[in-house]
Regions:
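A phosphate-binding catalytic loop at a beta-strand-loop-alpha-helix junction
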Residues: 124-137
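Cys-dependent protein tyrosine phosphatase-like superfamily
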Residues: 20-124, 139-177
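Sec-dependent signal peptide recognition
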Residues: 2-10
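Hydrophobic h-region of N-terminal signal peptides that target proteins for export
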Residues: 11-19
């Protein structure tokens, strides 16, 4: 009986380690695809500007399972992104975020955080046109979780928010709360 218990324990431990190893992405290989404003804020999440269809193919081959697109329907990617992503076996999710119309808000930040939590350790790419909206929503999430204004901005920058204009939008949004 002790032997069976030890075997089950070993299988559980090694199975968990294998699953953890599968969930981290080959960040270096993905970065070689030269995606605009590529960031790797987590071992299983990359943040980018708009990838091309070929770049999505590379990411799918390298372990990305889910795509979260923050672009609005009026922004043309030059191809049918949803169809391309799903044809590669990845799930596609869209949270349309418009900067000028108040889209940088707590509801959109929470929607993004809910998806990231739902996907657990699976490989995820989050993108908009440049990566700035990704970072802006992360800033709001960090602030909502108790981070200071400056730490929230720093974390947003780590996720791709490079625009000073958008950093100001985040500051203004957070100061209203």
């Amino acid at each position: 009986m002790k032997t069976l218990y030890r075997i089950l324990l070993l299988v559980t431990v090694f199975g968990s380690a294998a699953n953890a190893a599968e969930s981290s992405l080959n960040i270096q290989a993905i970065s070689a695809a030269e995606i605009n404003n590529f960031r790797a804020p987590e071992s299983n999440v990359v943040s980018t500007g708009q990838p091309t269809a070929d770049q999505f193919k590379i990411m799918a081959e390298l372990g990305v399972k889910h795509v979260i697109n923050l672009r609005t329907p009026g922004e043309d990617a030059g191809f049918d992104e949803k169809m391309a992503v799903e044809s590669l076996g990845m799930s596609y999710h869209n949270i349309p975020v418009s900067v000028g119309d108040g889209g940088i808000n707590a509801d959109n930040a929470q929607s993004l955080q809910n998806l990231l939590d739902e996907f657990g350790g699976d490989g995820v790419v989050v993108h908009c046109a440049t990566g700035n909206r990704v970072g802006a929503l992360i800033s709001l999430s960090v602030f909502e979780d108790g981070g200071s204004l400056e730490n929230s901005i720093q974390e947003g920058s780590r996720w791709g928010m490079t625009s000073e204009r958008l950093q100001q939008v985040v500051r203004d949004t957070l100061s209203e709360n």
